[in-house]
Regions:
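Structural detector for short beta-strands of small beta-barrel domains
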Residues: 18-28
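Long, highly charged, low-complexity intrinsically disordered interaction regions
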Residues: 26-90
Length: 90
């Protein structure tokens, strides 16, 4: 992987355990969504773009990025893979 652009490596090879979550839209605010999948409610931080895409839907699939730190495990949800990749470039 010598000389490979670090950003390209991040976007194409990120090591998420969860690629996406499909489930019932249980709660929705402009900054967070709760998707229930198989009895588990996943709280995801979302963008206004994803919020707009979810409005009025009872079920959805969100692509996920997991931020795992010593003091917190945070999930970010995105309406599209492209939105997630853009987030990873920031």
């Amino acid at each position: 992987m010598a000389h490979q652009d670090y950003r390209t490596h991040l976007t194409t090879n990120h090591t998420n355990m969860i690629n996406y979550i499909r489930g019932i839209v249980d709660e929705l605010t402009p900054t967070q969504a709760t998707l229930e999948a198989h009895g588990v409610g996943y709280l995801l931080n979302i963008s206004l773009n994803t919020y707009t895409a979810l409005q009025g839907k009872s079920e959805a699939r969100l692509f996920v990025y997991e931020s795992i730190r010593e003091d917190a495990w945070t999930l970010f949800g995105f309406a599209t893979k492209q939105e997630r990749e853009l987030f990873l470039m920031l």
